């Protein structure tokens, strides 16, 4: 704001001395003041600078929030991959064993021990079992897959390096969720409670050429190996020593009991 003042002019000079004397003395006169307000254009740069600084602050704040959110996302992914998935994998992997009475090999019941590694894939709905070489005989080492999506079971006899495929027997094999719950309940101990053994007999029927039709899980197990289909023998018969020469046994468990799978007519 600008302030401008003006002094008033003398109107006239009187002839007499009194008037001259009075006129010679300066008389107080009211000054005229004019107030000038600065033009609006002169104030705009100040407002523009303030507005620009506020917009810049908002941009920096937004960028900071984006960086913070990205950091939280990457931290969550890291924790999920390296902690949650690792814990989930540990919960789905079991190294366990079972004690059972062997009433098949001899007339005298002897106590046997069977160990196996079990991986249960709940989302994919299949089970993978690895039976190592038995310490006291009684069967071949094998890798077994129970694919509940395809309804198939595949046996990879490691001794023969051959694969055998048959329809999944749901009366013997527990579904992944039930089998997982069973193993979680006994995870505190090393072995399952002492149990018994049953026997099932399979017969080789035909060679399988198209392994991809068996599903991806069985395909990866049997790819590059001779693969045959099996048929479950309807009537059980006692396998004597002479007949057992043409059969291979795989002992495993996917339930509360042990199963001996005899694969006869092995090519």
Curated annotation (Swiss-Prot):
The chain crosses the membrane at residues 55-75. It comes from the Eukaryota. One of its GO terms (cellular component) is Golgi apparatus. Pfam families: BRICHOS. The record marks 242-243 as: Cleavage. The modification Phosphothreonine is found at residue 37. The keyword Transferase does not apply. Type I membrane-bound, as well as soluble, furin has a pre-eminent role in ITM2C proteolytic processing. PCSK7 and PCSK5 may also be involved although to a lesser extent. The soluble form of PCSK7 is incapable of processing ITM2C. Fails to undergo shedding by ADAM10 and intramembrane cleavage by SPPL2B. Disulfide bonds join 163-222. Belongs to the ITM2 family. This is Integral membrane protein 2C. It comes from Pongo abelii (Sumatran orangutan).
